[in-house]
Amino acid sequence: MKVNGIEPDINNISSGKYTLRRSYYLTHNGEMNHLQQDFLQYVLCAGQKLVAKKSIAVGTPTTFLSAKASGKLVINGSSSAAPLVKELAAEYMQLNPRAQVTVEVTDSSKGLTAAIRRECDFGISSRELKSYEKELLTANVFARDAIVLIVNKQNPVNNLSTKQIKALYETCNEWKSLN
């Protein structure tokens, strides 16, 4: 189904023309250590190949040579983005067996708060950061997803405005009552 006259295809979602989309963020507080830098570099480079299979990549996959930094990373946050981050972490640990990456599934707010408090190495968010979060954290978009509306083939409606979608969830009980 089109939203505001725009098809929900990869190009429209990536470019922002299709508006029912969101970004996935990896956030951190302050200077990163070598392991954090290495992991983030992987996610934004070679990891984009995996991202493209599961979601919408924000970059083109490029070659990644791990610095083989050792240590533990704790990543905390969004239940929507965590499955993808878990897969990225598993792939990264194959490239860098000296790293141990743990992904804790909570929600975006808890992940961002944990990153602000330095209770984790990265916070994961699937929502836009609030102004104070932007001041306290560095955020890197690593993937995008979109909400796509699917209706019965018999339904003649093929395009809705965001106002109409909101009405469907708040006040309308029938398709014919949409304006």
Regions from the PLM with identified roles:
Residues 1-179:
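Exported/periplasmic ABC-transporter solute-binding proteins
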